Amino acid sequence: MDSVRPRAPWAPPPDPASLDSPTCEPGLMAGTQLFRFREEPVPGGNRAVLEVRVPQVLHVQYGMYVWPCAVVLAQYLWFHRRSLPGKAVLEVGAGVSLPGILAAKCGAKVILSDSSEFPHCLDICRQSCQMNNLPQVEVVGLTWGHISKDILSLPPQDIILGSDVFFEPEDFESILATVYFLMQKNPKVQFWSTYQVRSADWSLEGLLYKWDMKCVHIPLESFDADKEDIAESTLPGRHTVEMLIISFAKDSF
């Protein structure tokens, strides 16, 4: 089992000056950020481009703007886009939902979720769907460690997405417990997660063992994410991000 250990500092929220077309709400500064994902170069051919727009809101709640991990996870989805049509995909801790929105645009059947305790984050999920003309994408409240009627009613998933959900160490076990419950519906489901390393003292190894899970690290260079400016953005910058695939220990990838 691979150990997951952070190695880099916390990333600050985006600079307000970097947001496009800012608009004001009571106590909030909002804008739109555009990401362009391009196909690999083909000799003599055109490169298809997929555009995703997401809202950005400067707010104390973390999920209201794009973090470096989200762009890396979205790039992994884009690299594997041909495997996504028809797949059932759930994004947890979605916030502005860049990975989930991209998956939906690539043909996956996507459900976006965020904490039911933060209605503004759920509103941001819905706004992302509206901006990308995805009325079919469902948004549900899902709080770490809580078995609610929403989580009970979720259908089996093929892929669970989570970008930078391992942010507060005190939440790590609640996150894995929630993922474990979701995996019970489909033991072959995979949890695709990006993780910004922040402290050498943090590790998921013990919790993964406790919950009978295993973790594989995916090299960033294997899906063209080993750069500072993915999807024509300024992210992930110089932050150290790891791509993880977590599954039940008894199942092989």
From Swiss-Prot:
Report, as the record phrases it, the tissue specificity of this protein.
Answer: Ubiquitously expressed.
By sequence similarity, the record places it as follows: Belongs to the methyltransferase superfamily. METTL23 family.
Q: What is its EC number?
A: 2.1.1.319
Identify the stretch(es) annotated as Disordered. 1-23
Q: What is this protein called?
A: Histone-arginine methyltransferase METTL23
Known function: Histone methyltransferase that dimethylates histone H3 at 'Arg-17', forming asymmetric dimethylarginine (H3R17me2a), leading to activate transcription via chromatin remodeling. Maternal factor involved in epigenetic chromatin reprogramming of the paternal genome in the zygote: mediates H3R17me2a, promoting histone H3.3 incorporation in the male pronucleus, leading to TET3 recruitment and subsequent DNA demethylation.
Q: Name one GO cellular component term.
A: protein-containing complex
Q: Which UniProt keywords apply?
A: Chromatin regulator, Cytoplasm, Developmental protein, Methyltransferase, Nucleus, S-adenosyl-L-methionine, Transferase
Provide the reaction this enzyme catalyses: L-arginyl-[protein] + 2 S-adenosyl-L-methionine = N(omega),N(omega)-dimethyl-L-arginyl-[protein] + 2 S-adenosyl-L-homocysteine + 2 H(+)
Coiled-coil region list: none
One GO term under biological process is:
cognition
Q: What happens when the gene is disrupted?
A: Mice give birth to significantly smaller litter sizes. Moreover, about a third of the homozygous newborn mice die before weaning and only a few survive to adulthood. Strongly reduced 5-hydroxymethylcytosine (5hmC) levels in zygotes.
Q: What does the record note on quaternary structure?
A: Interacts with HSPA5, HSP90B1, TUBULIN, UGGT1 and UGGT2. Interacts with TET3. Interacts with STPG4.
